[in-house]
């Protein structure tokens, strides 16, 4: 959530930045007018309360002097009614301000490229060379079926579209991948966490999913709980409403969890395969850092995600998202896109973001500076390290052989009982 004080004192700069995120000028003007109205009401309330205090003192003095105080009593009653009306109006203004500010996206960092959509994202670097096949490649969903490791038909029967069963070596491959990822992140200083897979509405507000993106989630009927869309939500909210000792920062968390998404607005997109599901596993990285260190930590986090792809020997590229393509809470985001041969393109497999103090303000996550003792908002970062199902898809397609078998990447073999190949049934 943006700081109202910052909006007030630096309105033109904030308005210009938010315009690059698609926020219209009318919304910003209304916000400014509401804030001015709020300050005017606060002044009126203070003045009326001061006058009421004077009237109250005059009544007390009149009673001590055994004088008639009817005029002062009437004046105080009028002032009390005025104060009640001002307070009611102020409550309405505060509610309107709060509802507006909570749906405003974060402002982009100064070095984020300007752009309306994904077509204006900027490529930063590439790693690896896409393999040249001397046979016709298959898509991962066809490979999974022919290998007997992915069952889409029964997933649809048991639940519905965008669900599947992993079985046999498919299940082992999935487990091997996320175990490998967690072990790699542990080497980089991340503390592994098994979080709740359901959270409350306050947690969803804290990380920015609520109230704006409620339709993208699965809420449990007649319950205060929501199925997590990503482990970012419980991990970030771990310190909600807390003050952390500054000496402990930065703090690194990692977790593997299922993620549940309604994929509202995705009808017709990626209807086959592992790219877009209602339920999928993802290894998440979350960091809590001091403001002056957060962008250095973003580079490290992105490198941690890249490390996984490099050890799996999967070609990828890193792009900086433009202002119009960034997520709601992000101030800056790097996407990692892995090469998918059957689609002859790169597809997102990780997104690493610095939200600066945007989530910390919503969730009231603060730290006490060890030098001056002051309490300040910290910065939160989050990143996929990686999306497990998409990693399965990338491995199946990049490691496929002409006979329909799939070679297991060397780093995963110790996690699969040294199996080195998955062959068709």
UniProtKB/Swiss-Prot annotation:
Molecular function per GO: ATP binding; catalytic activity, acting on a protein; serine-tRNA ligase activity; transferase activity
Pathway in which this enzyme or protein is active: Aminoacyl-tRNA biosynthesis; selenocysteinyl-tRNA(Sec) biosynthesis; L-seryl-tRNA(Sec) from L-serine and tRNA(Sec): step 1/1
Keyword terms, alphabetized: Aminoacyl-tRNA synthetase, ATP-binding, Cytoplasm, Ligase, Nucleotide-binding, Protein biosynthesis
Binding, L-serine: 230-232, 284, 384
Keyword set includes Protein biosynthesis: yes
Primary localisation category: cytoplasm
Protein name: Serine--tRNA ligase
The species this protein was found in: Streptococcus agalactiae serotype V (strain ATCC BAA-611 / 2603 V/R)
Gene that specifies this protein: serS
